[in-house]
Amino acid sequence: MTKNFYCLLLGGALLGSCTVQLAGVPNQTPAQVQATYRVTKDVAYGTDKEQTLDMYLSPTANRLKQKNYTIVFLHGGGYYVSDKAREERYIQPYLKKGMNVVNMNYRIKRGVPLATEDLTYALNFLRANNAAYHLDLNRVIVTGFSAGAHIASLVAVTANDPAYSPKLASGIKIAGVVNFSGPVDGLDVVEKVFMSNDVLVMKAIGVALFPETTDYAPKEYIRKYEPITYFDKNDPPFFIWQGGKDDQVPPVTFEKFVALLQQNPQKNEVLFVPEGQHSPSAAELATAYQAIFEFLDKKVK
């Protein structure tokens, strides 16, 4: 037997002997991740060419017992650029723990309203096809960076709103949200940040956020896409990472939402990094994931 295999056996024995705490699960090496995961790239969950996802299925995920979460990650890019392959650093910590991970694309350059639908479509696809994947869809953690984190947050807080469409299929429960720099309020502020930018691609992002309007979108329209509009005590636990020097999603846009989260510190976690930019550095990301696994251990049921 190889050394890697012995390590996996030892990890499995430890997991089987006690209540699992993700923070204490030994990290697999990159070689172990590559050797053990069943990876399927570019699975179509819709008819549009951008509606694809990557599946990372772990043969040892069931050993995580009550912490066998299904992680669904969405990339950033202002709903306009980027791709799931460009932000894999956000899923690596979960893979090292042996968790099942879905890394998804969504429709870009067509505005916030269309992009926000695709997470629901992807989750419903996973539910309809779960005989092939064997995911625990009663323990879904939706997560993302920037635009992707906004989408994750919006779907999480609207899941219990009977009037919101599209709807999640039965048999899906969002157990928690991990949001890196994603708008939760003040989308009008974010729109102005981008539309007033002298960099052409940044301005293009701002113009494309709400293509139904020709100028700045009215606040009453934007409010439909702000997670704070739907926030209530029945929403899943939130973990938010926020940079104090974020020049794309300004800290002021988080203030009201964070205040709501902090009313229940036993449930929610906010990691504010005063010197943090929009995108966390490698060191900031490592620190964040230490806190995220403790959040998943202690605050997510």
Report residues per predicted region.
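Short beta-strand/loop motif that positions the catalytic acidic residue
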Residues: 234, 239-242, 246
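N-terminal cap/lid segment of alpha/beta-hydrolase-fold proteins
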Residues: 22-64
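Primarily recognizes the serine-hydrolase "nucleophile elbow" in alpha/beta-hydrolase
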Residues: 124, 128-194
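Catalytic histidine-centered segment of alpha/beta-hydrolase-like enzymes
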Residues: 276-286
